């Protein structure tokens, strides 16, 4: 337990929260600070979401929903709507890149039509793209 506590402390100390461009570590720290413990998180495929699986604290079972085994870009927003319907008392956070967010037009109209409220965070991958990060 102490080792886990030390990891969390070091993770928060190393988060980049004061840079002009919001870095993923800073985003994750800010979200950790505000997320209720009963939150559910949906992720898209991509760099941000690979990082997110290690960066969030999960307090309840069935609180992380991700397509990482299938690489489904555009999964997060639609999954968030389904999670919110299944768990109406949970605060649902959906994280995705700008490409995944661009695939959510029909789901946006569904959310508005049925008054399904989730928190959606779309990150611009101008300099964080997976292909760029994998280049040597």
Annotate each language-model stretch with its function.
Residues 2-78, 83:
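Active-site diphosphate/adenylate-binding microenvironment
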């Amino acid at each position: 337990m102490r080792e886990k506590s030390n990891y969390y402390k070091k993770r928060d100390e190393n988060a980049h929260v004061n840079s002009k461009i919001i870095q993923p570590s800073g985003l994750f720290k800010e979200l950790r600070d505000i997320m209720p413990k009963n939150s559910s998180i949906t992720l898209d495929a991509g760099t941000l979401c690979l990082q997110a699986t290690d960066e969030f604290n999960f307090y309840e079972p069935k609180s992380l929903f991700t397509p990482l085994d299938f690489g489904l870009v555009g999964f997060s927003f639609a999954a968030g709507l389904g999670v919110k319907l299944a768990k109406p008392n949970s605060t649902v956070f959906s994280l995705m890149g700008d490409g995944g967010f661009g695939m959510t037009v029909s789901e946006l109209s569904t959310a508005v039509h049925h008054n399904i409220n989730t928190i959606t965070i779309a990150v611009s991958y101008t300099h964080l793209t997976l292909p760029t990060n994998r280049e040597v």
